[in-house]
């Protein structure tokens, strides 16, 4: 219900003509960034970039969740804590976009805040289970779920082809692929 209300608020604040397609942007701005096609054990992408590079909203949306505390421990290795500092938004396309291992989250970024494509959400880092690794942005694309459903939040489709398109200035939407992943999961 909360997510529906957030979408309604977003729609009222930022009305978009019915024919206008969402605009997508690459989630790391003003820095050299590289990434592979596949993640090590589930659908996501690690975008390698220098610490402090801007993590930006890839689409207009509403902030869903923010984690400002890095409580991950290698001893317990709890999945819900692996992302360290993180931000997830629900895009105007109804898809969740998740960035984690951040070194910093921007002041004012909080659940319910409306963001625009390209707006800085935080900075690339190595928090959570990335502690001790090269800085990178873990980037996941998924469908919205109940709070705390970290296995979905971290990613359900491989983002690389969308990242390739967005980096080239093209608006390739992951909506159909996310809907298919959700249906395949029986959700």
Summary of predicted features, one role per range:
Residues 140-169:
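Short peripheral tails and domain-boundary helices/loops at the edges of structured domains
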Residues 4-13:
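Sec-dependent N-terminal signal peptides
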Residues 39-42, 91, 101, 136-138:
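Histidine-centered active-site/metal-ligand motif
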Residues 17-86, 92, 117, 126, ...:
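Surface-exposed, glycine-biased beta-strand/turn segments
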Residues 86-110:
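Active-site region of chymotrypsin-like
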Residues 72-78, 124-138, 144:
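Active-site loop architecture of trypsin-fold serine endopeptidases
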Residues 65, 101-104, 123-126:
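A residue-level detector for short acidic-glycine micro-motifs
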């Amino acid at each position: 219900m909360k997510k529906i209300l957030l979408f309604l608020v977003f729609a009222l604040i930022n009305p978009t003509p019915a024919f206008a397609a969402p605009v997508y942007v690459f989630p790391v701005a003003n820095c050299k960034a590289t990434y592979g096609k596949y993640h090590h054990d589930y659908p996501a992408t690690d975008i390698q970039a220098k610490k402090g590079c801007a993590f930006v909203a890839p689409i207009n949306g509403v902030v869903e969740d923010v984690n400002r505390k890095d409580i991950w421990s290698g001893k317990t290795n709890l999945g819900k804590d692996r992302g360290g500092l993180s931000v997830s938004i629900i895009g105007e396309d109804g898809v969740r976009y998740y960035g984690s291992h951040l070194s910093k989250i921007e002041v004012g970024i909080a659940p319910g805040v409306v963001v625009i494509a390209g707006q800085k959400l935080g900075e690339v880092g190595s928090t959570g289970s990335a502690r001790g690794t090269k800085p990178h942005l873990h980037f996941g694309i998924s469908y919205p779920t109940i709070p705390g459903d970290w296995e979905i939040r971290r990613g359900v489709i491989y983002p690389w082809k969308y990242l390739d398109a967005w980096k080239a200035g093209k608006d390739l939407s992951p909506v159909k692929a996310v809907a298919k992943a959700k249906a395949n999961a029986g959700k």
